[in-house]
């Protein structure tokens, strides 16, 4: 017997129609390069996205063609998030922070036909234009520059196109967007998102025990729209009818706080480096920003520290940890306390909240051991985290040599080493490649980093394993101090000794002005390992 429900395709046009039909007067705000604010509504985005679809079709867009973007967090990028897939194309957001050689490889590997680039980023495009042959280059006048010769003007194309648009018969499993991983381990890899995955992911992010995005929210996405499907925020905000505030090319802490105050932001999303800067500004300028309403900050991309969480709570902000990957669209876990946990001690509650949390609804997770057995949920047994679900990638685009990243029964092997406790909360111990093997025992670099960043003088800390003649590897910590503070190796060693066994504490502390990072804000440990490859340990 079959169910008697409508067979209604889960496609992006449904989200766009909802945004216009119910929330058409809700604002979308963009900070422009001159720091002025441009305002329009979901209704305006609806019309312009449909114009974009017509314009792309007139330029010759075919079903499944890839349209690349080289744009900041701006309204035109939001328009592309909808305009490209409703035309039957595949939106491909290029990570503008990658090396030009890598951008060229990605665009060629994806087979991008068209490029939409804003005039502010034309210098970035110039660095790889000779290596990628786009059929059309469409320039957005974000900074007000004249469209270069040989390119199409974005506003001119939209002005010539009609708002009247008939959606093609899109299938929910058709490709809607794609994004490449940041390439920390070898070449960047393409992840292709279906309409169905995006719609289900968006509905999930509106859930109470998830991002909890609603029509009452004003959302500030500080996570780049060109990274990891923009954390799904354009589609989630359309589903919920939330106001969206886009920071444009700016990520300075004071500018972020100005936007939060002026636009009454209730939800911000970003990586730890952004939030560290915002917290530092709040601490340095007490009382400058009058933000008296509840604000939720979601943090992903790297582990949060207790010091960061406690710091924001001093200022009345709440912080929630997330976990996901480009391969998971990207939301897969979030960390919220269960009702029975509210009676726990403060220390125990912080410990639980700093975990990556429980898998979100209809995403499954397991810990697998090297011998192929599944680990118990005891909060101790460490193995590789594997996940599966309706918005988890089943393979990489045109890279059959990467098939080993999936288990024989179809689970994604994340490369993260983790354990799961009795309540189902996942705690990442480290990336498998970043664990330190010392004297036959494993040491977590992440735990050491988070502990070090709890020291009042430490701004950032990255820990790596360095070859040792006796112990195989020993931990070395690279530390950036807060401005105007001092700390010495002996002091930091003593600070860590309160939480770690003596053999787990780094044998060396190197003080630096900055730590190299990836394009998405993670520590670039490959660069650190190369830097300290010839490190000589003291006898």
Roles of regions detected by a PLM:
Residues 24-26, 159-180, 187, 212-218:
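Conserved pre-ATP/AMP-binding loop-to-beta segment of ANL
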């Amino acid at each position: 017997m079959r169910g008697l429900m409508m067979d209604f395709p889960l496609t992006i046009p449904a989200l766009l129609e909802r945004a216009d039909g119910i929330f058409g007067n809700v604002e979308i705000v963009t900070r422009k390069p001159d720091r002025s604010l441009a305002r329009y509504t979901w209704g305006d985005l609806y019309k312009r996205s449909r114009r974009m679809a017509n314009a792309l079709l007139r330029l010759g867009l075919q079903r499944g063609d890839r349209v690349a973007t080289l744009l900041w967090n701006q309204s035109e990028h939001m328009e592309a998030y909808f305009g490209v897939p409703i035309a039957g194309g595949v939106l491909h957001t290029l990570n503008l922070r990658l090396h030009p050689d890598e951008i060229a490889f990605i665009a060629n590997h994806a087979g991008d036909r068209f490029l939409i680039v804003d005039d502010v980023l034309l210098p970035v495009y110039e660095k790889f234009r000779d290596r990628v042959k786009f059929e059309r280059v469409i320039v957005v006048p974000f900074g007000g520059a004249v469209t270069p010769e040989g390119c199409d003007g974005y506003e001119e194309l939209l002005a010539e196109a009609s708002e009247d648009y008939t959606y093609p018969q899109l299938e929910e499993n058709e490709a809607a967007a794609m994004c490449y991983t940041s390439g920390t381990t070898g070449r960047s890899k393409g992840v292709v998102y279906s309409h169905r995955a995006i719609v289900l992911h968006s509905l999930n992010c509106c859930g109470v025990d998830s991002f909890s995005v609603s029509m009452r929210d004003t959302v500030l996405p500080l996570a780049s729209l060109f990274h990891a499907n923009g954390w799904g925020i354009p589609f989630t905000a359309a589903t919920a009818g939330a106001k969206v505030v886009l920071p444009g090319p700016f990520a300075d802490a004071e500018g972020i706080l100005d936007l939060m105050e002026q636009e009454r932001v209730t939800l911000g999303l970003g990586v730890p480096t952004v939030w560290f800067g915002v917290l530092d500004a709040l601490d340095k300028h007490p009382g400058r920003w009058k933000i008296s309403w509840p604000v939720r900050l979601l943090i992903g991309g790297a582990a949060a520290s207790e010091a960061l969480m406690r710091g924001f709570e001093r200022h009345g902000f709440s912080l929630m940890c997330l976990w996901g990957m480009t391969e998971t669209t990207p939301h897969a876990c979030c960390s919220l306390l269960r009702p029975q946990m509210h009676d726990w001690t403060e220390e125990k509650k912080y410990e639980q909240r700093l975990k990556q949390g429980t898998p979100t609804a209809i995403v499954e997770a397991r810990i697998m051991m090297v011998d192929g057995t599944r680990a118990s949920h005891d909060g101790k047994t460490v193995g590789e985290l594997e996940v599966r679900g309706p918005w988890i990638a089943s393979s990489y685009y045109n890279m059959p040599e990467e098939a080993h990243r999936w288990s024989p029964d179809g689970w994604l092997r994340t490369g993260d080493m983790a354990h799961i406790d009795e309540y189902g909360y996942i705690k990442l111990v480290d990336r498998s490649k970043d664990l330190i093997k010392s004297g036959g025992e494993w040491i977590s670099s992440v735990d050491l980093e988070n502990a070090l960043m709890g020291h009042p003088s430490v701004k950032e800390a990255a820990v790596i394993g360095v070859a040792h003649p006796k112990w195989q590897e020993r931990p070395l910590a690279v530390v950036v101090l807060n401005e105007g503070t001092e700390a010495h190796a002996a002091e930091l060693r003593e600070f860590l000794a309160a939480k770690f066994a003596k053999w787990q504490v780094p044998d060396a502390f190197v003080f630096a002005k900055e730590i190299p990072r990836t394009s998405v804000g993670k520590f670039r440990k490959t660069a650190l390992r190369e830097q300290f490859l010839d490190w000589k340990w003291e006898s």
